[in-house]
């Protein structure tokens, strides 16, 4: 239970720290940079068997790791280590009636050095990143914003379907600061993207991440009414070269890592692949394995 209490306390702190973790240092928010770009409606529809959550990987998939040589191809000096699906899921505190729980770290014992990868927005659509993610079998929880991702939802469908059990989740229609909106306006942003993602990917996403990490009680009520099961925040954000921490100066068991689908224009010339390689190196340097977030919820 002490892990559950720690999670609740951490959630309160993360709300105040979230904006600084996305908007300072080497990072530039791609939504703010791109503005309200016109995007085309996705023309494809999901197949009868498609779903927003790909089938869980077998022992050769994300939880068993990539091929022995794949890591060298992408600039790593050792294979990425993956955590198996837990025999029993951690205890997550329940939300008040009519709301959804807010999670910023998975409550794990100190000896379970496991972290989780999440990528936001969808501005960058680098085909080489698709190859990297498939080769390494990275289990990525995607949080997509329609205003930048919808110009090529097919890119993220390929990422979901690459055998790593990556998932598609909700990051609003237009990436607003939800605290500034009424309940009805928040519900439109959240439910609207739920509807679009369900239509395009075949399943209503269970997870929602508020832009900038900003939310209030209306957000939690709106998310519940839109069919969301949990609001996901984070404790660590990947910048261009290094992590930025909400607490301390190192990864902690259960940390949810925030990264973005970004390219050279947002990363000061670095590519999405270079940023991801550095992120994986930092995880390895601290002796952590990567888990599939949804397996722990």
Protein language model features and the residues they cover:
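N-terminal low-complexity, Pro/Thr-rich disordered segments
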Residues: 24-105
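Active-site beta->alpha N-cap acidic-glycine motif
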Residues: 75-177, 196
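His/Asp/Glu-enriched short active-site or ligand-binding loop at hydrolase and phosphoryl-transfer sites
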Residues: 214-253, 290-294
């Amino acid at each position: 239970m002490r892990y559950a209490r720690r999670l609740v306390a951490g959630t309160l702190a993360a709300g105040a720290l979230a904006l600084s973790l996305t908007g300072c240092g080497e990072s530039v928010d791609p939504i703010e940079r791109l503005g309200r770009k016109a995007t085309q409606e996705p023309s494809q529809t999901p197949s009868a068997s498609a779903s927003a959550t790909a089938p869980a990987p077998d022992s050769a998939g994300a939880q068993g790791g990539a091929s022995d040589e794949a890591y060298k191809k992408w600039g790593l000096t050792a294979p990425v280590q993956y955590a198996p699906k837990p025999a029993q899921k951690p205890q997550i505190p329940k939300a008040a009636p009519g709301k959804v729980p807010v999670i910023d770290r998975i409550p794990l014992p100190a000896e379970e050095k496991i972290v989780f990868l999440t990528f936001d927005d969808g501005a960058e659509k680098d085909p080489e990143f698709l190859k990297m993610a498939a080769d390494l079998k990275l289990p990525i929880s995607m949080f997509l914003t329609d205003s930048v991702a919808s110009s090529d939802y097919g890119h993220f469908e390929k990422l979901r379907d690459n055998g790593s059990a990556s998932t598609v989740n909700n990051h609003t229609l237009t990436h607003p600061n939800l605290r500034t909106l009424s309940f009805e306006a928040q519900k439109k942003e959240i439910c609207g993207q739920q509807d679009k993602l369900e239509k395009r990917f075949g399943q209503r996403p269970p997870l929602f991440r508020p832009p900038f990490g900003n939310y209030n009680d209306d957000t939690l009520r709106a998310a519940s009414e839109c069919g969301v099961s949990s609001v996901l925040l984070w404790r660590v954000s990947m910048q261009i070269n290094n992590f930025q921490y909400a607490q301390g100066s190192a990864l902690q068991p259960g940390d949810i890592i925030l990264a973005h689908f970004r390219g050279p224009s947002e990363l000061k010339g670095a590519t999405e692949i270079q940023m991801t390689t550095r992120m994986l190196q930092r995880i390895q340097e601290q002796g952590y394995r990567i888990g599939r977030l949804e397996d722990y919820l």
